A protein has these predicted regions:
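Short loop/turn and capping residues at structural boundaries
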Residues: 28, 46, 109, 149-150
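Short beta-strand-to-loop elements that line the ligand-binding cleft
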Residues: 1-9
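Conserved C-terminal helix/tail region of periplasmic/extracytoplasmic solute-binding proteins
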Residues: 139-185
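Short secondary-structure boundary/hinge segments and terminal tails
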Residues: 34-35, 52-53, 115-116, 155-157
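Residue-level marker of alpha-helix boundaries and capping positions
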Residues: 3-4, 22-23, 125
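Secondary-structure end/capping motifs
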Residues: 67-148
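Pocket-lining segment of extracytoplasmic ligand-binding domains
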Residues: 11-102
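Residue-level detector of short coil/turn "hinge" positions at structural boundaries
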Residues: 1, 42, 105, 145-146, ...
Length: 185
């Protein structure tokens, strides 16, 4: 059995699966429904398995984080703002999905939006249990992963600082004032 790395794009993984280059892969909406339409069978829905898994990560080297803390904080603020935009601007977000994935099928784009808006937290804190699941899955390749501490793989200090500064709450206030302005216009 050949299993393709999740480092590939979803479109690339779907193409490889359809061509028979791999036996299985991981797909999320809208690519999972595309696979079903092509006659491929779903083996499991990770959302229904009650397994916490860190599927989306933001990474930087320790050296970069130490030497460029302002850039790290600025990036994270932008990322948090984009998550807020996604949650509060459905139509624009669906349009962006269709544009960047070159999709014509609005229903599939909405399916992808609904999946990700539910999946992505307002503040992207790492999950110790999610990282532990990944470490356990790597144990056959990296025996040291079994005994590794999940906390050694992430630094939440920047996110805590951003949250404590009131930045995240201010996004909600901006949304409310924008909606009020839109109603007056």
């Amino acid at each position: 059995m050949i299993f393709i790395s999740v480092a590939e794009s979803q479109q690339g993984r779907l193409n490889a699966l359809y061509r028979g280059s791999v036996s299985a892969t991981v797909l999320a909406p809208p690519f999972d429904s595309m696979a079903r339409q092509l006659g491929l069978r779903e083996l499991a829905d990770l959302r229904k398995l009650d397994v916490e898994y860190s599927g989306t990560s933001i990474a930087a080297t320790g050296g970069y984080v130490k030497s460029h803390p302002a850039a790290v904080e600025s990036f994270l603020k932008g990322y948090i703002e984009s998550l807020h935009f996604m949650r509060t601007q459905r139509e624009k977000s669906v349009a962006a999905i269709m544009n960047y994935l070159k999709m014509k099928d609005r229903a599939r784009a909405e399916e992808g939006y609904d999946y990700y808006v539910e999946l992505m937290p307002p503040i992207p804190y790492a999950s110790a249990n999610g990282v532990k699941t990944i470490l356990q899955s790597l144990a056959h390749q990296q025996p040291k992963a079994v005994n590794a501490s999940p906390e050694d793989f992430y630094d939440m200090s920047f996110l805590k600082k951003i949250e404590e500064s009131g930045f995240v709450k201010s996004l909600g206030a901006k949304s409310a004032s924008t909606r009020a302005h839109d109603r007056k216009s």
